[in-house]
UniProtKB/Swiss-Prot annotation:
Designated gene of the protein: mpaA
Pathway field: Secondary metabolite biosynthesis; terpenoid biosynthesis
Family per record: Belongs to the UbiA prenyltransferase family.
GO biological process, one term: terpenoid biosynthetic process
Subcellular location: Golgi apparatus membrane
Name assigned to this protein: Polyprenyl transferase mpaA
Lineage of origin: Eukaryota, Fungi, Dikarya, Ascomycota, Pezizomycotina
Function: Polyprenyl transferase; part of the gene cluster that mediates the biosynthesis of mycophenolic acid (MPA), the first isolated antibiotic natural product in the world obtained from a culture of Penicillium brevicompactum in 1893. MpaA is a Golgi apparatus-associated enzyme that catalyzes the prenylation of 5,7-dihydroxy-4,6-dimethylphthalide (DHMP) to yield farnesyl-DHMP (FDHMP). The first step of the pathway is the synthesis of 5-methylorsellinic acid (5MOA) by the cytosolic polyketide synthase mpaC.
Alphabetic keyword roster: Golgi apparatus, Magnesium, Membrane, Transferase, Transmembrane, Transmembrane helix
Length: 315
């Protein structure tokens, strides 16, 4: 381990630390920009701040995950070359990197919320991020508690941050959380679906080490199980869109997601473990598409497009 670190220059070390944060890869936290709080005047400013906050916090969480799982990762074919698992980054370096990302994310949240409710939002999210890697231990499978549950909560929770950044001075935190429950549920179900598919890539090595993951529920019927999980976010989307009254979102969001998820399940092959990774990638693209669709909706709302269409129809 020592030799690997000594041979790395500062530039190589920086790249290795970045890879522990997954900044060099796609991340589901990017999709948190696709919340209904985007439909206000200063959306771009607030969305940009939320993006940076989520990026930093997700990076810290990924580094923490690699710290806790470094011994497991070293025995899994797909993850054995990760910087911590391979010994290219030391524990001290990773801890410093993680701490820096975390406190920068707190600073960004302070800026987003103007100093309001920072730790009320940050502490539950921090606790879930810290707990996540430990739920992979086999003891939790006995009570049917899987890491995907916590991951779904952690990825859905920042939707509350987005809404609080806009209405926090006018709404109590309890009302903000209540308002965000539908979008949080959507992201929770969605994350459980695509992460179960993603983790199935490692099922062969995971079974050897008795690693806990949601795909163990399905056994040999993983495709049927994924089909069931994929229906849950699709059932949640109509409730969200119906409150916005946007034909555009019915087409760009609901219809697009339905077609995409049907294709994902149709193309999934349990005998080809890499097909789980394909589902994860497809859903990253789906998240980016949803961000774009919501941004278009913001523009349509600003010019009162749907009101004008409704008035034209009445004529």
């Amino acid at each position: 381990m020592t030799n690997a670190v000594e041979d790395s220059g500062p530039r190589d070390l920086l790249f290795l630390l970045i890879s522990t944060s997954r900044f060099n890869r796609y991340m589901p936290y990017y999709t948190m920009m696709a919340a209904e709080s985007l439909s206000i005047e200063f959306i771009l400013y607030k969305a940009g701040l939320c993006f940076v906050h989520c990026l930093l916090l997700c990076g810290a969480g990924n580094t923490w995950n690699d710290l806790v799982d470094r011994d497991i990762d070293a025995r899994v074919a797909r993850t054995k070359m990760r910087p911590l698992a391979s010994g290219k980054v030391t524990l001290t370096e990773a801890l410093l990197w993680m701490t820096g990302q975390y406190f920068l994310s707190v600073k960004m949240l302070d800026l987003i919320l103007d100093g309001r409710n920072i730790w009320s939002l940050m502490l539950p999210l921090t606790a879930s991020i810290m707990l996540y890697p430990y739920l992979k231990r086999p003891i939790f499978s006995k009570v049917f508690v899987y890491p995907q549950y916590i991951l779904g909560l952690a990825i859905g929770y920042p939707a509350i941050t987005g809404w609080a950044s806009i209405t926090g001075s006018e709404e109590p935190l309890g009302d903000i959380i209540k308002h965000c429950i539908p979008i949080c549920l959507l992201v929770f179900f969605w994350c459980v679906y695509f992460n179960t598919a993603y983790s199935h890539q490692d099922s062969v090595d995971d079974r050897k080490m008795n690693i806990n993951s949601a795909y163990v529920i399905a056994g040999q019927r993983i495709r049927l199980f994924l089909a069931f999980l994929s229906v849950l976010p699709l059932l949640t989307i109509p409730y969200i869109i119906s409150t916005i009254n946007s034909p555009w979102l019915w087409v760009s969001w609901m219809a697009t997601w339905t077609v995409s998820i049907i294709m994902q399940i149709a193309q999934f092959d349990s005998q080809k473990l890499e097909s789980g990774g394909r589902i994860h990638w497809d859903n990253f693209l789906l998240g980016l598409w949803t961000i774009a669709a919501c941004m278009v909706e913001v523009g349509l709302q600003k010019v009162e497009f749907w009101k004008n269409v409704e008035g034209y129809i009445k004529l």
